Swiss-Prot record:
One GO CC term on file: cytosol
The protein, known as: Chorismate synthase
Organism expressing this protein natively: Sphingopyxis alaskensis (strain DSM 13593 / LMG 18877 / RB2256) (Sphingomonas alaskensis)
Gene: aroC
Gene Ontology terms, MF aspect: chorismate synthase activity; FMN binding
EC number: 4.2.3.5
Positions annotated to bind FMN: R125, S126, S127, N237, A238, G284, K299, P300, T301, S302, S303, R325
Binding residue positions for NADP(+): R48, R54
Amino acid sequence: MSFNSFGRVLRFTTWGESHGPALGAVVDGCPPRLSLSEADIQPFLDKRRPGQSRHTTQRQEPDQVRILSGVFEGKTTGTPISLMIENVDQRSKDYGEIAQAWRPGHADYAYDAKYGIRDYRGGGRSSARETAARVAAGAVARLVIPEVQIHAWVAEIGGDAIDPANFDLEEIDRNPFFCPDPAAAQRWEALMDSARKAGSSLGAVIECAASGVPAGWGAPVYAKLDSDLAAAMMGINAVKGVEIGAGFGVARLRGEENADPMRPASDGSNRPDFLSNNAGGIAGGISTGQPVVVRVAFKPTSSILTPVPTVNKAGEATDIVTRGRHDPCVGIRGAPVVEAMMALTLADHKLLHRAQCG
């Protein structure tokens, strides 16, 4: 299987399967002499780690990361950084039923159609478990962009959205939903309980903003910052849609409404102040100095207890019920993953910009 790598200068590759002995990432192109230890990576993995509430999979994985290469005496050496996370709580017997039948909405059939073989234990590479490696790699990328602050939050679950008037960034780490609206988080408790008891699942929308990004990162046409961000987010398992800034909403605006008006800078510099940010901090594929903003749509988890009509490998009609431990809303734990992909993309573009423009 190819296409497991992302990035141009800062390039990372993820490896491993959901029910294999381990998974991980190799980060290549990281500048030398940056301070790095497992302690710099672990807090981000802990945010994504499963089994921390009844609203996520009950698979108990400590997700302890090990740095195998690329670091000497606490500093990056400029050589590939290999990161490994062991799997310790696999229950492959739960997946016997899907060895011969495909889960609608999952990658089972597509993998069989392409490769003629698939690891049905937890979905293999198509499992959300793969994203642990992205989060580890993203923690390394953050060291390359210390001037940038990245925050992601769940903005909507099952069609129930937060109220922007109640937005409080400090609330994100105070509830199991990465939710900045306490009232919405309370509603989601009941919403998630209802879906789980029904043997079903829910989708979610994640919003992510990166502040401190200077003007100038990105490139025209085929290396646009927004196109790379879209590819980064769409590469996350279970993601079905990405918006930059106002996204699809711009199609409903007039030109004067969509434009982000500029005024002379309040700090006296030659950089303008913007009065709005419909562009999401990117114009012509290049950052403007405003916050870079993306919205990411996660589909409902395909592995559910509700019987779903399908076909088995013999071509026979059947119903499938996916037993085992699964996220009733995979988007909840998607927030740290979206942050990681934002960091990896921005770090890559910072190094690209430095290579071309100094």
